[in-house]
Amino acid sequence: MLESPGTFGADVVVGTTQRFGIPMGYGGPHAAFFATRDKYKRNIPGRIIGKTKDLNENPALRMALQTREQHIKRDRATSNICTAQVLLAVMAGMYVVYHGPKGLYNISYSIHKKAIDLNLKLSELGFKQINKHFFDTLQIQTNILEIKKQAELKKVNFYYPDQNTICISLNEASTVK
């Protein structure tokens, strides 16, 4: 469905696994990912997980690099806090295993289609979409005052980054209603 960010020239990519079965929790906690090109890997904090093969030649993930600076070179450390997010990472992993590649594709396709449909409907109503490329989140340029008041009355939670923008994010639980 999507190409690797490296094909677009990205040197560093970050993202969240909250979508993979982790309930919303006021912005966290949830596991995330951080990836970079090989030439930058020694400049990033924390640990690097690499792909390898297990004893049966199946693809497997393993800790490929852990900077020891936080233990032995504290004055030059790029990180000194390691939060255990293992449970959340396992939950996200199990969500992926449960749904499988086809299931994940279907979920992501459904979410993206909802975003496209909403964008078309909002365009018909005269609203201007700011972000030309989107997957699940629309940025609408408008005066937010009246819309915010109506949304709060109906207990709809939008994100308002400024007085003229509404961000609407959709997920697998979003409906046409």
Language-model segment annotations:
Residues 14-22, 46-51, 71-79, 99-106, ...:
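Short beta-alpha connecting loops at secondary-structure transitions
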Residues 125-152, 170-173:
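Conserved PLP-binding catalytic core of the aspartate aminotransferase-like
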Residues 57-127:
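Structural motif of enzymes handling amino- and sulfur-group chemistry
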Residues 13-16, 129-131, 158-161, 168:
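General beta-strand structural signal in soluble alpha/beta enzymes
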Residues 1-60, 122, 126, 135:
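Conserved PLP-enzyme active-site core in the AAT-like
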Residues 150-154, 159-177:
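Noncatalytic alpha-helical scaffolds and linker/capping helices
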Residues 8, 27, 39, 43, ...:
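Conserved active-site and cofactor/substrate-binding residues in soluble primary-metabolism enzymes
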